A protein has these predicted regions:
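Active-site-adjacent beta-strand anchor residues
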Residues: 18, 85, 107, 222-225, ...
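Glycine-rich beta-alpha junction loops
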Residues: 46, 135-137, 224-229, 266, ...
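Conserved Rossmann-fold dehydrogenase catalytic segment
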Residues: 166-174, 197-203, 209-228, 247-254, ...
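Aromatic-enriched alpha-helical interface/lid elements that frame and gate functional surfaces
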Residues: 255-315
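Short, surface-exposed loop/helix-turn segments at secondary-structure junctions
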Residues: 52-60, 238-247
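Short Gly/Pro-enriched turn/cap motifs at secondary-structure boundaries
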Residues: 63-64, 72, 249-254, 260-261
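Oxidoreductase and adenylate-handling cofactor-binding alpha/beta cores
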Residues: 182-201, 217-218, 230, 234-242, ...
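N-terminal helix-loop segment corresponding to the beta1-alpha1 unit
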Residues: 1-213
């Protein structure tokens, strides 16, 4: 953070306009800022980013109201801020003047919103890297639908895999699709900047062997659900090749044991993962049960997976 604050880092000299709200687009812009980019946050006058209203809150001495949002403290840091109503003619003009000085714009409005305001990619400089985050992407039958993180993890398939086998699906503990998509979008933005400025991307211009070419920007379409699809391990391949419809497994895995969160004597839990034969042998020694390594049910990973209930119960 000290390098970024001082304008150092690999993205020093790059300017990012964060016109998003809630988590995904601001998080993407924040990651670029941590790499040294100059990030400018654009917020609606009076209302500001919705994250300012998300708790928990820290009381501010001498001020009324709920206090200072910790959500905003985490995701709104590391950037300068301006207010600008993009729905008004004056606001549109101010935004265009600001974007003319920038390299990247990050937004996560419902698809079509920026175009309706006259601020879509075709209305802005052609060398801009335009990051667009939404639940379902910028095209397709679901594109116009609004939504937040929960729909991303549901439509992407993660929600159905989270929880106990005999219970309803459970939301992960954090907003996974928002944060994950922010990471993928930041990676794509850096790649697009490299392609634009070094000339090995679709719009490489002069550096790509065209002496009269102009550097080209990119429009990055980053759907929440697609980020979730990318981390589903073997789920899609298993269905495509073997017809397996993966189900919830709780804390355990069908092919690996021992693996669980085990209760402790002080009323807490300890996470133990000992899938490999070497790790299992060390665990048995720590439990003072070395004979378990010779038990036919536990002699190797496949055997332990087939008898996961037995070995997890012993542990």
């Amino acid at each position: 953070m000290s390098d970024a604050a001082a304008g150092a880092g690999p993205l020093a000299g790059i300017r990012v306009i964060d016109v998003g709200t809630r988590i995904s687009a601001p998080f993407c812009a924040g990651l670029l800022g941590e790499l040294g980019a100059d990030v400018i946050k654009v917020e609606l006058p009076g209302e500001g980013d919705f994250m300012r209203t998300m708790g928990p809150f820290v009381p501010v001495e001498g001020e009324g109201g709920a206090g200072y949002s910790l959500s905003w403290a985490v995701e709104g840091r590391g950037r300068r801020g301006v207010t600008c109503d993009l729905r008004q003619p004056e606001g549109k003009e101010l935004f265009k003047r600001l974007v003319a000085t920038a390299d990247v714009v990050c937004e996560n409005f419902r698809p079509g919103t920026m175009e309706r305001w006259g601020l879509g990619p075709d209305d802005l400089p052609s060398d801009l890297v335009f990051v667009r985050i939404s639940v379902f992407g910028q095209s397709g039958p679901y594109a116009p639908r609004p939504g937040l993180d929960r729909l991303g993890i549901a439509f992407g398939g993660l929600l159905n895999l989270t929880g106990e086998p005999d219970r309803p699906p459970v939301r992960p503990g954090v907003t996974v699709s928002d944060y994950l998509t922010g990471v993928f979008a930041a990676f794509a933005a850096v790649s697009a900047l490299y392609g634009r400025d070094v000339g090995r991307g679709p719009g490489g211009g002069a550096a790509n062997g065209d002496p009269d070419g102009e550097p080209g920007g990119e429009v990055i379409d980053a759907p929440l659900y697609a980020s979730i699809l990318r981390i589903l391990e073997w789920t899609l391949a298993g269905y495509d090749t073997l017809g397996i419809v993966r189900q919830r497994e709780g804390n355990r895995l069908a092919h690996s044991a021992p693996l669980d969160n085990y209760p402790t004597g002080d009323g807490s839990y300890i996470c133990i993962v000992a899938g490999s034969d070497a790790n299992f042998a060390r665990l048995c020694a720590a439990m003072e049960r070395p004979e378990l390594t010779e038990d036919p049910r536990f002699v190797n990973l496949a055997a332990r997976g087939a008898h996961g209930g037995d070995i997890n119960g012993i542990v």
